Structures are given as structure tokens and as C-alpha cells.
Curated annotation (Swiss-Prot):
Glycans are attached at N11, N27, N113, N197. Receptor for extracellular adenine nucleotides such as ADP. In platelets, binding to ADP leads to mobilization of intracellular calcium ions via activation of phospholipase C, a change in platelet shape, and ultimately platelet aggregation. It comes from Cavia porcellus. ADP binds at K46, Y203, D204, T205, N283, L284, R285, A286, R287, Y303, A304, T305, Y306, R310. The lineage of its organism: Eukaryota, Metazoa, Chordata, Craniata, Vertebrata. It is found in: Cell membrane. This is P2Y purinoceptor 1. Keywords: ATP-binding, Cell membrane, Disulfide bond, G-protein coupled receptor, Glycoprotein, Membrane, Nucleotide-binding, Receptor, Transducer, Transmembrane, Transmembrane helix.
């Protein structure tokens, strides 16, 4: 199924042909005048895949992310005390992922409803805000985890004072403040718009009215909160790998956890973060500067690829729990212990209920005068 959207009206990333205020579509004179005055804009061609691909991905992310991060938060709160510095960062990462997956049911319904948003402008803004808070909060907390592991591997003695839990708490609070302040403009840029067919879109970026300033803002956040952390992470991992090669850490838990950390974080960046930021930037550039008849097919392909990377960007909420399990401090051992304890408690409860049931049956027989037992 292909939906061709009107080129003469703004074509936001989620939808096009929004009705302009005060514009009368039934007036042929006004229509011809506006068409002559308006610059050419490519018609945004929507293929049916986005109505099924994105909700399918979000359903998987919601189920796995909700279960995985719920277990992680439960473990950190009840079974991981006292926390180490890296546990503080991982708890905050799990919290950011959990808050994000809670917003996915509304987004799943939105795409199954043919991108007709019914939850109001405030909920649309909150939806896009939480997505970006999770995106950049996750990147910064992964950077903190990587720097923490780098200090422990490369400078194990010098870093003892710097790796305390108290410092990790202060840094985590600072990360949340930085992310919330940096992402707060999303509350202005995002929002809803009314299409010509009276359905409502929820912009994942912004409308064409604010596109130029949004592009500048997007580039600033991409450089400051994606490119810089990526360079820091790559630097940390390069030095970690070098230390693992030259230091006598064969078969040590620190070596194993460090290798897992490098593999998982680099996989998350390669699959989720890098493609999303590249295609988001290309899509914004296409909307701004590639509006010629010759570029319309290219723009459609960029837009379709960008939609694919939006789904990939949400997968980090599923992958992060694997990080806690493989690279966390004693997480796997304590999870196994907590599971065994819960299993023993369950068996004890079942045995107790069975004994109570047996006693009740015997009591009833005695009351009825049955002496055959």
C-alpha cells in the first residue's frame, strides 16, 4: 500500500499535507495562487511497511525491555546492595530504559491506527521527550560505565578513590540534569499537526515551520551527546584492550567482564545509535535542501531508511539487560542466588499448603467418625 501525500503543504517527518490556518482548500483561486507562490516540495510517499514494521519492533522492545529492565531494577534494589560505582550507573541506565518502554504502548497504537494520534498534544510532546531522554541518557551512562571500567583496568590503584559509589551518585545526578536540560527544547519542537484528511500526526522531529532551527539544534545535540561520547568510549576501549593484552589478567573476572563490556557497547552503537543519527541527519537535510523533482525518489528512500533506524534505536532497551548480566559486578551470581532463594521459598510454600490440606482432610474424616484410617 502506498500513500502519496500532497507536495504543496508541509511534509513533516511523520506526515504531510497539514492544513494551513486560514487556508480554504475549496477555493480554486486561493489554491492556484498558493500553488504558484509556494516553493516546490517533494511528495512524501509512505509505504505500508512503516505501519507494521515499527509497531512490530516496538512490541518486541516493550515485552523484552519491560521484563529485562524490571528484573534488573528488582535486582539492583533488593539483591545488589551494597552498590559499587558501576552498579549505580547500571541502575540509572535500567531506569532510563524502563521509563522509555512504558511509553511504547501509545506509540504502538499510533502506528496500528495508521499514524492517527488520539492522545493529545501534551502526550505527543512527552512521548518524543522521553525517547530522546532515554537515547542520550543511555549514551552518557554507557560512557560513564566505560570510563569506570577503563579506570579500574588501566589504573587499578590510582583510581580506587575515584571509583567510590558516592562519586558515581554525583555523576549520575549530573548526567540526568544535563540530559533533561539539553533535551527540553524537544518539548517545543515536537507536537501534533492536523492533516488535510483531519487525522492527527505526532511529529517525531518537528514541522516545516521550525525545521531550520531544529536542524541546528539536532546537530548540536548529535555532536555534544553522541559524537563526543562515542570518541571517549572508543578511546577508553582502545586503552582497555591494550591493557588486557599487556597486563597479566588471563582468565580473571575483570578481564572477562571488560571484554563483554567492549563487545556489547560497541554492538549497541553499531546497530542502534550510529545508523539512527546518520539517517536522522540525512532526512533533515533532505527536507531542507533536497526539494527538487530529481531528488524526490532519493528523499523517499532516505525517509524509509530513517524509519528503519528509528526501530533500531529502540533496541538498546532490550540489549542493556544483557550488559548487566555479563559485565556487571556480581550481577549474574546474585541473580542466580535470588532465583534459587525464590524457588526454595515457592517449594516451601507448596509443601506447607500440601501439609495443611492433608491435616484438614484428616480432621474432616475424624469429625465424620471415619475410623478406617
Amino acid at each position: 500500500m502506498t500513500e502519496v501525500l500532497w507536495p504543496a503543504a508541509p511534509n513533516g517527518t511523520d506526515a504531510a499535507f497539514l492544513a494551513s490556518p486560514g487556508f480554504h482548500w475549496g477555493n480554486s483561486t486561493a489554491t492556484s495562487t498558493a500553488a504558484a507562490a509556494a516553493p516546490f516540495r517533494c511528495a512524501l510517499t509512505k509505504t505500508g511497511f512503516q505501519f507494521y514494521y515499527l509497531p512490530a519492533v516496538y512490541i518486541v522492545v516493550f515485552i523484552i525491555g519491560f521484563l529485562g529492565n524490571s528484573i534488573a531494577i528488582w535486582m539492583f534494589v533488593f539483591h545488589m546492595k551494597p552498590w559499587s560505582g558501576i552498579s549505580v550507573y547500571m541502575f540509572n541506565l535500567a531506569l532510563a530504559d524502563f521509563l522509555y518502554v512504558l511509553t511504547l504502548p501509545a506509540l504502538i497504537f499510533y502506528y496500528f491506527n495508521k499514524t492517527n494520534w488520539i492522545f493529545g498534544d501534551a502526550m505527543c510532546k512527552l512521548q518524543r521527550f522521553i525517547f530522546h531522554v532515554n537515547l542520550y541518557g543511555s549514551i552518557l551512562f554507557l560512557t560513564c560505565i566505560s570510563a569506570h571500567r577503563y579506570s579500574g583496568v588501566v589504573y587499578p590503584l590510582k583510581s580506587l578513590g575515584r571509583l567510590k559509589k558516592k562519586n558515581a551518585v554525583y555523576i549520575s545526578v549530573l548526567v540526568w540534569l544535563i540530559v533533561v536540560v539539553a533535551i527540553s527544547p524537544i518539548l517545543f519542537y515536537s507536537g501534533t499537526g492536523i492533516r488535510k484528511n483531519k487525522t492527527i500526526t505526532c511529529y517525531d522531529t518537528t514541522s516545516d515551520e521550525y525545521l531550520r532551527s531544529y536542524f541546528i539544534y539536532s546537530m548540536c545535540t548529535t555532536v555534544a551527546m553522541f559524537c563526543v561520547p562515542l570518541v571517549l568510549i572508543l578511546g577508553c576501549y582502545g586503552l582497555i584492550v591494550r591493557a588486557l593484552i599487556y597486563k597479566d589478567l588471563d582468565n580473571s573476572p575483570l578481564r572477562r567482564k571488560s571484554i563483554y563490556l567492549v563487545i556489547i557497547v560497541l554492538t549497541v552503537f553499531a546497530v542502534s545509535y550510529i545508523p539512527f543519527h546518520v539517517m536522522k541527519t540525512m532526512n533533515l537535510r533532505a527536507r531542507l535542501d533536497f526539494q527538487t523533482p530529481e531528488m524526490c525518489t532519493f528523499n523517499d528512500r532516505v525517509y524509509a531508511t530513517y524509519q528503519v533506524t528509528r526501530g533500531l534505536a529502540s533496541l538498546n532497551s532490550c540489549v542493556d539487560p544483557i550488559l548487566y548480566f555479563l559485565a556487571g559486578d556480581t550481577f549474574r551470581r546474585r541473580l542466580s542466588r535470588a532465583t534459587r532463594k525464590a524457588s526454595r521459598r515457592s517449594e516451601a510454600n507448596l509443601q506447607s499448603k500440601s501439609e495443611d490440606m492433608t491435616l484438614n482432610i484428616l480432621s474432616e474424616f475424624k469429625q465424620n467418625g471415619d475410623t478406617s484410617l
